[in-house]
């Protein structure tokens, strides 16, 4: 069906759309960033091109402090100070919706202003959910390159010992685990499995307070597709700054009215883009400029650029389904 109208036939009010979009988007971002304790960061910035690159210095592999005797003249050995380049990749998104003009008129609502505000808020929710899914898919895909950070085989739920082991994959940096992100199915399994465990007893009474079933690590329950592993699920122990999603372009909104339809249909198209970065990994630019979520979830799309595994974004435990 051809569209015969033009932009001027239906007006999107910038004030209503943008106020609803950015107010809701800011609320979503603030809540999510706080809830993950800085593990998954969503932010905004303007970035040109397909890739965002940054250079960082690697931690020295050997000691830089050496003892010496000032009375002996010896040859000095210099340690190599190396840097690495991390690449964030830009992904593009769009969304298209339509609604009859009469649907608003019958409620005595202004279709222009009401639709602008409604779609602005819905767009913010859509951007946030897609950003979280894409970012988490990228992190979980990248970490598959390092088997030491992948625990479990999908045959059981994580016990206290498994949760403790996941933390101490980071050795003396175990406190870097900021939160656990898990599917509700896995969360139910953890509680079912550990509900009879006693962390402390006082006069015969069991004391279990706070986040006892995850050893006091904050747990976020989110039924995200990225946490599904076939018929089973993944449980992500995320460190601070595990991933960053930068909303790197202004959200564009385009409108039109389909006059070939009876009744007339309001059509609305939204386009946006953001850059995805994973801690300790660099996107392989040979995989292309327009990666899909499936490409980002593939471990071959990411190259480890840090030499210390304690700088990797997460530990994953593969759990069975309830």
Predicted regions: what they are:
Residues 82-147, 180, 257-280:
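Long, contiguous amphipathic alpha-helices that act as assembly "spine/axial" helices in icosahedral shell
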Residues 141-220:
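Extended, solvent-exposed, turn-rich assembly/linker loops in the middle of proteins
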Residues 1-88, 231, 306-322:
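N-terminal "assembly arms/tails" that initiate or stabilize quaternary assembly
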Residues 184-187, 204-267:
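Extended serine/threonine-enriched, polar tracts that run as long, contiguous segments within proteins
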Residues 103-173, 289-322:
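Alpha-helical scaffold segments that mediate packing/assembly in large oligomeric complexes
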Residues 3-8, 145-153, 243-244:
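Extended alpha-helical solenoid/rod scaffold regions
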Residues 1-32, 248-252, 256-322:
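Protruding loop/beta-arch "assembly-hinge" segments enriched in small, turn-prone residues
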Residues 65-66, 189-192, 230, 277:
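Short helix/loop capping segments that flank catalytic or ligand/cofactor-binding pockets
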